[in-house]
Amino acid sequence: MPAERKKPASMEEKDSLPNNKEKDCSERRTVSSKERPKDDIKLTAKKEVSKAPEDKKKRLEDDKRKKEDKERKKKDEEKVKAEEESKKKEEEEKKKHQEEERKKQEEQAKRQQEEEAAAQMKEKEESIQLHQEAWERHHLRKELRSKNQNAPDSRPEENFFSRLDSSLKKNTAFVKKLKTITEQQRDSLSHDFNGLNLSKYIAEAVASIVEAKLKISDVNCAVHLCSLFHQRYADFAPSLLQVWKKHFEARKEEKTPNITKLRTDLRFIAELTIVGIFTDKEGLSLIYEQLKNIINADRESHTHVSVVISFCRHCGDDIAGLVPRKVKSAAEKFNLSFPPSEIISPEKQQPFQNLLKEYFTSLTKHLKRDHRELQNTERQNRRILHSKGELSEDRHKQYEEFAMSYQKLLANSQSLADLLDENMPDLPQDKPTPEEHGPGIDIFTPGKPGEYDLEGGIWEDEDARNFYENLIDLKAFVPAILFKDNEKSCQNKESNKDDTKEAKESKENKEVSSPDDLELELENLEINDDTLELEGGDEAEDLTKKLLDEQEQEDEEASTGSHLKLIVDAFLQQLPNCVNRDLIDKAAMDFCMNMNTKANRKKLVRALFIVPRQRLDLLPFYARLVATLHPCMSDVAEDLCSMLRGDFRFHVRKKDQINIETKNKTVRFIGELTKFKMFTKNDTLHCLKMLLSDFSHHHIEMACTLLETCGRFLFRSPESHLRTSVLLEQMMRKKQAMHLDARYVTMVENAYYYCNPPPAEKTVKKKRPPLQEYVRKLLYKDLSKVTTEKVLRQMRKLPWQDQEVKDYVICCMINIWNVKYNSIHCVANLLAGLVLYQEDVGIHVVDGVLEDIRLGMEVNQPKFNQRRISSAKFLGELYNYRMVESAVIFRTLYSFTSFGVNPDGSPSSLDPPEHLFRIRLVCTILDTCGQYFDRGSSKRKLDCFLVYFQRYVWWKKSLEVWTKDHPFPIDIDYMISDTLELLRPKIKLCNSLEESIRQVQDLEREFLIKLGLVNDKDSKDSMTEGENLEEDEEEEEGGAETEEQSGNESEVNEPEEEEGSDNDDDEGEEEEEENTDYLTDSNKENETDEENTEVMIKGGGLKHVPCVEDEDFIQALDKMMLENLQQRSGESVKVHQLDVAIPLHLKSQLRKGPPLGGGEGEAESADTMPFVMLTRKGNKQQFKILNVPMSSQLAANHWNQQQAEQEERMRMKKLTLDINERQEQEDYQEMLQSLAQRPAPANTNRERRPRYQHPKGAPNADLIFKTGGRRR
């Protein structure tokens, strides 16, 4: 314990110390010169002089090394912290991404439900409307039919016509109007008809009605007028029927009948028959004859299918008794009743049904035939695309026409099938065979969403897919009024985009032609190597110049103080700082919210176009900005693509060998926009084709840059795969034929294999039973620090009675390298909990781990290094969780330094000279469990092992394989120093192989002496070190203060310093620590007796036989310990006082000054601080005074602590005195005030006690805390 430090000597005393020291040295030299020879004097003087610099140099080196170690340790800690922070950030981002995905899925599901509900509601409304219209039409027809059938009985008499207008002018005008009947003229025509006498104009009126060019919507008005004619004039219906028959007979001679007129006429006569103007016999026969003529003439081409569909839709329910499938489903789904067909009997409807079904059968045959032809055309076009990369214009145009007619035929077939309540025929789709699209990926069956990590995916990983596909929807955040001007243009562009997409899809599937024509076309079709030009190149250049010129004009016209202009300029200046997805999305939203004007959009396009050529990292984010803004402002993408297209065309035309960075920037920007689908794939492939047409110099770099940017996207997209593959093969052929430079060859190969990597062998996943897969999932995936208890519960539920399951679990635990390195301790924890229920599992796992470690040393192959590291780590964790004894750990450690190592130091095949992996294994085990070898016998065992370990390390360092050119790895030195500094911070490391060997020899000699195998005479040289060893062992019993004496005083804050505070507790702790290896009782017998220095060796102990008395005793002991713990839990814990009082006789000795006449002693006492060391041997306490130099950290810290305590005492003293003085002044002022208010003399201090005046001026506690007399 440190005593009170003496005051330092004055400056005069310090100055006089060197002189006194020199005098004493000279006197000693004169006296000794008489007794010793001169040579001895010189040698001793040299030793004394040279010893001090060496010690100082060693201290400086040690301080420097420790400082470096601390700095390195600090850097490592900072690195670990940075890694942890990055991991946390990644986990947070992952969680955030998962949360966003979950929200998107929920929103999508909600939106889907809403859409389904809206669709169902819309369907219901349509069904109800259809139901209402059907009933209204049914009632109108029925009412009108009854009127027309009863017309002969209700026609007016002759005198009625005399009152009507019979003038020629009005009647001829009315007849002319009948040639242009429309629904809007119904009321006016009905009014004119009621006021005219048309009995002499019936023939003209009939001719006008038959010749009228009606629309489908005007038929009802014409039927209404015919009903009026029929109800008033008896000869109208026969005349009309005769005219219709003549009209249809004349139409038979027409080669190209008018389909619109035919459709209208057929419905017209059907409506006239339904409403009763024509009799059923006359009308139905006319309708059947005309319908049969149409169908017979159209059985092959089916050009009149629209006429039949119109007839079935408007009149099929009454004429043919048709009930459409849509009506049936609506009636069943919404419980609606549609009107029955009561106008015409079912017997008369049957011929019409048969005729229509025959027509539908022929239509389906036609559809199947066209479908087969279309499939053949698709296969032929794929062959052409695969071989040549593109289709000819004639074939392209021919297929477009054929595909359009097929789609029209398919739609008509579906409509007619619904009206006739028939099923559509099966139209199977062709599955493309591998030879159609050649070797490589299957681009026609792309992976499902979430399978982009598989071979054949468009994107390299999930992050790339999210970056290029998951864009924010500005329309969901920005008010619609901010992009209202662009809505129409956006819709037009989207429709054009859809048309273009259909054209592209049709480009893959084309046309009808014979095999001979196809072969001829394949031979004639070649890729033209002439210089190609992009369409609209001149317009693109003009747009570039126009936009760049407008910048100067706007800058001149814009007012310098414009607030919006300042905002836009600031936005464009900050745009290069948007280097991640969140920032660029925020910038897009900001621009759309605050700066969406035509002029600002042009400024943005210019800023994006003139991005610096060195900032290629900005191009993906700028392309994302353009793609994000595209739904709201499509002109940004269009203008930018046009400018890039013109710039590309300019560079290709110029053919200079400068500005390669600008060229690469342009093509890379085009590639990024292509991946966002802003730049069309056709244009991108056309750019690549232009570069391949003149494949030299900069064009090679531009082509490779373009392919490295978007080649994978183009090659793996179905619509561009074939053309891209053809262009890639052409590029490789040109590489072979053109004898390019080695740099260009490498670039071309890299670009090609980036787009189309060679097929890799797929790893076949081993199939295991479900229970084994579940065990592997628990141990290798689910197990973590948080889920250990949960996994243990699940593991306990396994069928342990099944030996196969038990063996598999043991095997999985032994194969610890399959577990994440940071989760190995969780497996040890799990095993420790599992052993309580399955005892033999722990034994088998430990045996397996030890066997694997031994096997690793025997095989010694580098591919097992990570596996061996995991096994060593697992063994250390098993000791931490008390699954193995310390003897197993030390046996393994010694095997690392001795197995396969030749005693004579010669190289061994099991441990080659350059092989340092065993050192790493030792450090791994010591880093894992070495911290628990800090006291008792395990501490001494570790100290002994470290001696042997240093010898092994120095033996490795001394081998000839390590030279100046190939030095010993510094990371191994750092790893060893880190491990030893953690375990024994005060250990003195060896500096050479000889020193390490000498330490091993000394250590072995000491133990041989203790064992009595060597006489003391043979080891006189080692007596002093043997005494030191005994002192170390004695001091281990009483405490760890010797660590302070033997090591560096700077490490005074170690936990060992606390052990000397209480001797009894220390003994108990040491006994408890010695018995930590509790798995077997024999370990206690093997430990060294702490009371005696002799070593006792015992053989195998007696086996413990369990009995009932032992179990009763253990139960009673557990009960007593539990009661004791419950009693002690209520007691207050007494904190141990670290400072032990110094005996009085030592205090008086310490207060005495240094011996007189000793200048050197005074100097030493001035530079040192006296401490008292308390030791104990047996029951006897021993005190020893230590003079610790002031340069040590221990003395400096204690001196600073004393000064701080002294300052705190002085501060409290001053504070207390100030409080007392202030209280006295307040009392005095109060007394004067009370005397002034009461002139009459009175005893005011009658109840107040007299003030106690402390002799030293201490504060009055009663006065301060007001516990004295009462105040008034």
Curated annotation (Swiss-Prot):
Region (Sufficient for interaction with UPF1 C-terminus): 1084-1272
Cellular localization per UniProt: Cytoplasm, Perinuclear region; Cytoplasm
Phosphothreonine modified-residue sites: 1088
Alphabetically ordered keywords of this record: Coiled coil, Cytoplasm, Nonsense-mediated mRNA decay, Phosphoprotein, Repeat, RNA-binding
GO cellular component: cytoplasm; cytoplasmic ribonucleoprotein granule; cytosol; exon-exon junction complex; nucleus; perinuclear region of cytoplasm
Mutagenesis or variant effect for residue 932 to A: Does not impair RNA-binding
Subunit description: Found in a post-splicing messenger ribonucleoprotein (mRNP) complex. Associates with the exon junction complex (EJC). Interacts with SMG1, EST1A, UPF1, UPF3A, UPF3B, EIF4A1 and EIF1.
Annotated protein name in UniProt: Regulator of nonsense transcripts 2
Gene source species: Homo sapiens
